């Protein structure tokens, strides 16, 4: 029989590789691990990679297995979902994986300048009504700059045409260096081991016949970021925990 939410929360509170700091608990309180993840938790100087909005954490666990010479931190506010990946990685004895339960809106509170090498955004909510909530908006890019290494890598993997299109416009508006881009990942030349890791929700989109889109780009430290001023067609479908929530056909 599966565990209920309260049992999962109790597990998470006891796991040594889980850090729980929701917004309500860290308001103006410094995070002791900031700037010390390498020496105090991972015990090495390997690159740190974040997955923001990790859901169940399958992608982080998959990457951690694939790259023992990198450190991975999965971030989400939903502890009951993260429990799946946190439990799997603990039972597997993985030492290069951690989980941070917090609000992504305050992500810069947990990492020092240059402490993170890469960011993965896997099937993030496209937030079609409000640009400042999108994890690829300039609002968040400014946050990422506070802890990402110069020219650090950002990966976007999404089912949402809206999110993909918006991100392309954001990249173009700011002339950010793009390393790879495709509107149909599994029919492109880049289906390598990393990108073939499939999350629970990704498989749902594939089963519904949706193409998976992918962009890999770099974020320089210099330059004032400009938010794109364009109208983008909204996604016509409803997906897990997502809806247009609006009668509009386009949004900025």
UniProtKB/Swiss-Prot annotation:
Pathway listed: tRNA modification; N(7)-methylguanine-tRNA biosynthesis
Cellular component terms per the entry's GO annotation: tRNA methyltransferase complex
EC number: 2.1.1.33
Pfam families found in the cross-reference section: Methyltransf_4
Keywords attached to this entry: Methyltransferase, S-adenosyl-L-methionine, Transferase, tRNA processing
A GO BP annotation: tRNA methylation
Enzyme class: transferase
Sequence positions that bind substrate: 129, 159, 199-202
Role, per record: Catalyzes the formation of N(7)-methylguanine at position 46 (m7G46) in tRNA.
Entry similarity comment: Belongs to the class I-like SAM-binding methyltransferase superfamily. TrmB family.
Record protein name field: tRNA (guanine-N(7)-)-methyltransferase
Gene responsible for this protein: trmB
């Amino acid at each position: 029989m599966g565990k209920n939410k309260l049992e999962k929360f109790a597990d998470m509170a006891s796991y040594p590789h889980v850090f729980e700091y929701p917004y309500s608990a860290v308001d103006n309180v410094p995070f002791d691990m900031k700037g010390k993840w390498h020496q105090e938790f991972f015990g090495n100087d390997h690159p740190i990679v974040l997955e923001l909005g990790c859901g169940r954490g399958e992608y982080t666990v998959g990457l951690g297995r694939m790259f023992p010479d990198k450190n991975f931190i999965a971030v989400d506010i939903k502890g009951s979902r993260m429990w799946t990946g946190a439990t799997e990685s603990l039972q597997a004895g993985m030492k290069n994986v951690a989980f941070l339960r917090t609000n992504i809106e305050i992500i810069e509170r947990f990492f020092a300048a240059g402490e993170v090498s890469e960011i993965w955004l896997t099937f993030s909510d496209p937030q079609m009504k409000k640009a400042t909530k999108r994890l690829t908006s300039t609002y968040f890019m400014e946050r990422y700059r506070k802890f990402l290494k110069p020219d650090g890598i950002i990966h976007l993997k999404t089912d949402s045409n809206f999110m993909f299109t918006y991100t392309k416009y954001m990249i173009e508006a700011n002339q950010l260096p793009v390393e790879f881009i495709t509107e149909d990942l599994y029919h492109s030349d880049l289906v390598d081991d990393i990108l073939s890791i499939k999350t629970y929700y990704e498989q749902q989109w594939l089963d519904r016949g949706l193409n998976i889109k992918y962009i890999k780009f770099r974020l320089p430290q210099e330059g004032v970021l400009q938010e794109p001023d364009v109208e983008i067609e909204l996604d016509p479908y409803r997906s897990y925990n997502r809806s247009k929530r609006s009668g509009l056909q386009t949004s900025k």
